[in-house]
């Protein structure tokens, strides 16, 4: 059966994850990713399209993947106490990335650039690895990362690709296979925030402080505390620090105010994962108060390759049941509900000053929200890969 003369069919807008497999895979380069009014990237077909149908063929939304066997679940933490102490969770991502780099491989993951925009980059040495560490709950622009992954694989190098489950699925669809030298790690994600809204936050912080924000830690811990904090460092040494739940960014993420529409019906919120390994949150239940304070990660082993890599990592580990894992991380069982105010929020963004919109929709949490366990649970799961925080 040929793909010729097949009209280009892309995922319905409300289901499109923005994985960019179609854009990377178009043999004519006739698809580009364009931001919409909410700041999310969507594929746009240009006049260069020859209607080969390849984009339809590789779209993860339009072509369902085969289910996998039930994963094994482990509570893990890095054997290096310094790394663990300065990590968002247990330092598992650091161990995995260093394992690949030490073997001469390349690590792909989400990073913040000088303008605090989130995009996927390739890291080839330990010196640059901190760029990939830490939580980034804003949707990452994968750019041409899938093409770069193929290039490094063709050169015979091992590659680790980390990202949301839809990005990992998009990579596999683009490649059309599961190469032996490719290791994938998806994160149990509760949704990705709007890059457009995040850009407005960055501009707002710069205006209020009258100085450029240089770095952001979305889910930091101070002095080994388990409370997640939103921390910003500015160019003249000024800082902003608050519990994530008390920051406008955290409130918006927790309320599902500016997540990508497809996230609210996400088909990846289950234990049937796309990566060889899955990083999840483990903040209660099967862990002790001391483990919660120091930080541990929940790791799912989804494939034989994932098990082989896991056995090589310098991680302390303890087996837990899959039921405990699902109970610990909401992203393994259901999508994030959409806010009833979401449409009004984005309508207001087009008509009113940003600070005015924040005051109306992202003000202090209502008592029922502040006390609700589901909200706290959600805040623990909105992220990209775990990892080491930069020391202050």
What is each residue range found by the language model?
Residues 1-6, 48-155, 321, 325-341, ...:
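Flanking helices and flexible, charged tails adjoining ferredoxin-like Fe-S electron-transfer domains
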Residues 3, 8, 12-15, 21-44, ...:
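Iron-sulfur cluster-binding cysteine motifs and their immediate structural context
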Residues 6-16, 41, 46-50, 156-159, ...:
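Immediate flanking context of iron-sulfur cluster ligation sites
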Residues 14-29, 50-62, 164-170, 259-271:
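Local cysteine-cluster metal-coordination motifs and their immediate loop/turn environment
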Residues 88-91, 114, 161-171, 191-193:
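Gly/Ser/Thr-rich loops at beta-strand to alpha-helix junctions
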Residues 103-106, 211-392:
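Long, compositionally biased charged/polar accessory segments in the mid-to-C-terminal portions
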Residues 128, 176-188:
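A short alpha->loop->secondary-structure connector
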Residues 183-204:
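Short, flexible loop segments at boundaries between secondary-structure elements
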């Amino acid at each position: 059966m040929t793909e010729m003369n097949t009209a280009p069919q892309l995922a319905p807008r409300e289901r499109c994850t923005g994985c960019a497999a179609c854009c990377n895979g178009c043999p004519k380069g006739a698809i580009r990713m364009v931001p919409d009014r909410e700041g999310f990237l969507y594929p746009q077909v240009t006049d260069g399209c020859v209607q080969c149908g390849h984009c339809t063929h590789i779209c993860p939304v339009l072509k369902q993947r085969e289910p996998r066997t039930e994963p094994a679940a482990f509570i893990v933490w890095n054997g290096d106490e310094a790394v663990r102490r300065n990590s968002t969770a247990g330092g598992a991502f650091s161990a995995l990335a260093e394992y690949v780099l030490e073997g001469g491989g390349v690590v792909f993951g989400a990073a913040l650039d000088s303008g605090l925009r989130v995009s996927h980059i390739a890291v080839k040495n330990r010196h640059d690895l901190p760029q990939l560490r830490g939580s980034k709950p804003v949707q990452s622009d994968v750019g041409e990362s899938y093409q770069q992954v193929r290039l490094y694989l063709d050169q015979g190098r091992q590659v680790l690709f980390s990202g949301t489950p839809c990005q990992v699925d998009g990579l596999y669809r683009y490649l059309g296979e599961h190469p032996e030298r490719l290791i994938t790690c998806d994160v149990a994600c509760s949704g990705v925030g709007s890059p457009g809204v995040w850009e407005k936050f960055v501009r707002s912080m710069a205006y209020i402080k009258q100085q450029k924000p240089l770095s952001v830690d979305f889910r930091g811990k101070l002095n080994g505390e388990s409370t997640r904090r939103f921390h910003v460092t500015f160019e003249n040494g000024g800082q902003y620090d608050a519990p994530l739940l008390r920051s406008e960014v955290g409130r918006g993420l927790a309320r599902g105010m500016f997540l990508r529409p497809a996230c609210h019906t996400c088909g990846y919120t289950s234990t049937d994962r796309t990566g060889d390994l899955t990083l999840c949150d483990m903040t209660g239940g099967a862990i002790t108060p001391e483990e919660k304070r120091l930080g541990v990660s929940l790791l799912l082993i989804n494939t034989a390759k994932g098990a082989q890599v896991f056995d090589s990592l310098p991680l302390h580990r303890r087996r837990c049941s899959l039921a405990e894992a699902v109970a610990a991380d909401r992203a393994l069982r259901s999508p994030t509900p959409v806010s009833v105010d979401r449409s009004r929020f984005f309508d207001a963004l087009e008509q009113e000053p940003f600070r005015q919109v924040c005051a109306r929709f992202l003000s202090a949490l209502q008592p029922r929200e502040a006390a609700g366990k589901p909200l706290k649970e959600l805040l623990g799961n909105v992220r990209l890969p775990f990892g080491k925080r930069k020391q202050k």
